[in-house]
Amino acid sequence: LSWNSSTGITESFLDGVLENWKNQQQLGELLIFPTQDYSAYSSLDILNFIDKNNPKSAIMIIAFSAGVVGAIGAALAWQQLRGEIQGLIAIDGWGVPLIGNFPIYRISHDYFTHWSSALLGGGIESFYADPAVEHLELWRSPQTTKGWWIHQTSTGLKTATPTTARTFIQNVFNSLN
């Protein structure tokens, strides 16, 4: 797993999504990109970080805001180097085209961001907050951010299910494992 954003808010995000994230980090199963040292939007820096940590299996990338720019570029480059991408969760990467041959999931802090970003690649499934929340609130508190999980049924019917950002992210993890 690979994550990026500023440290304090990222810890709040991880607390809201994963119960044992500190153990996973100690075991090397969870990598946190050091945005205090590198730009979150730098695909090259993220790619070098992934390569340096030498993951032994497919990776799931979660990125927030400008970090989505760097993450999609790094994911595509990692694949070019024969690395495996399990999926990308793009949180509030407004205006960032998301195209890849791996599962992509978009999460937005409001409906407008969700709708307008979907024009640039919506991904397999998505989530948007309703009622809308502040941009940083989505990253800080996914467990309390309510909204709609957009997905298709097995018959192709597009469906909206009420949930939280936390539950959406956990469902993505469960579907990929």
Predicted feature descriptions by range:
Residues 1-57, 107-114, 121-177:
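Active-site catalytic motif of lipid deacylating hydrolases and related acyltransferases
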Residues 8-9, 69-70, 96-99:
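Short catalytic/ligand-binding loop motif for oxyanion handling, primarily in non-cytosolic enzymes
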Residues 60, 86-89:
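Residue in the alpha/beta-hydrolase core beta-strand immediately N-terminal to the catalytic nucleophile
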Residues 61-71:
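Gly/Ala-rich beta-loop-alpha elbow adjacent to hydrolase catalytic centers
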Residues 73-86:
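Conserved hydrolase catalytic core segment
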Residues 89-98, 109-112:
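Active-site nucleophile loop of the alpha/beta-hydrolase fold
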Residues 97-102, 117:
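Short loop/helix-cap segments at secondary-structure boundaries that form the rim of catalytic
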